[in-house]
Design a protein with these regions (language model features):
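Acidic catalytic patch
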Residues: 67-100
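Acidic, PIN/NYN-like endoribonuclease modules and their adjacent C-terminal/linker elements
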Residues: 110-165
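Alpha-helix capping/helix-boundary segments
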Residues: 9, 41, 75, 108-109, ...
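Short, hinge-like loop/turn segments at secondary-structure boundaries
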Residues: 52-56, 86-87, 139-141
Length: 165
């Protein structure tokens, strides 16, 4: 199954709490999963990435189930279709209240996800989620992923009781 992820998911994968990271690691470890990273989302991630972010990206790039998907000619055509539909419906921003530049980048991310056959787009961006849903693309958030057993079961490190005798 192919899953597209956006910039905020990438950021959470590197900087999130242990539960968030465990959920995403478990998703990626599943044998039938291919993660699609649209290049506009990757660029947004890299703007704020530090050395840890770059190291993480380098470690992921060599994996066959981690696909960086370009905004190429075919994606541009898909994106143009999305915008043309919005314009036909009377609002080039598709009803979004976001800045025009954000709407354009969101469309690029969505076009890439659709073009590469993503089953769903994982995002915490409400605007992108609404736009994707309106175009027939299912969206999910990280908390929709199951929590791995390895982080559910924790050992309590208790000190032995003091001997007060």
């Amino acid at each position: 199954m192919k899953i597209a992820i956006d910039a905020n998911v990438l950021v959470e994968w590197v900087t999130g709490d242990e539960f968030t990271i465990a959920r995403l690691d478990a998703l990626f470890a599943a044998p039938d999963i291919v993660l699609i990273i649209p290049t506009p989302a990757l660029a947004e991630f890299l703007v704020g990435a530090d050395e840890v972010g770059y190291q993480w990206l380098n470690s992921m790039e060599g994996k066959s189930r981690f696909q960086i998907a370009a905004f190429d000619r075919r994606a541009a055509m898909e994106c143009a279709l999305l915008e043309a539909k919005a314009r036909r419906n009377g609002n080039k921003k598709g009803g979004s209240k976001a800045a025009w530049q954000k709407v354009k980048v969101d469309r690029q991310v969505l076009a890439i996800a659709k073009l590469h056959g993503a089953a769903f787009l994982m995002t915490a961006d409400t605007q992108l989620s609404q736009f994707a849903n309106g175009c027939g693309m299912e969206t999910r958030v990280i908390d929709d992923l199951p929590l791995p057993e390895s982080v559910k079961q924790r050992k309590l490190e208790l000190e032995p009781p003091e001997d007060n005798s």
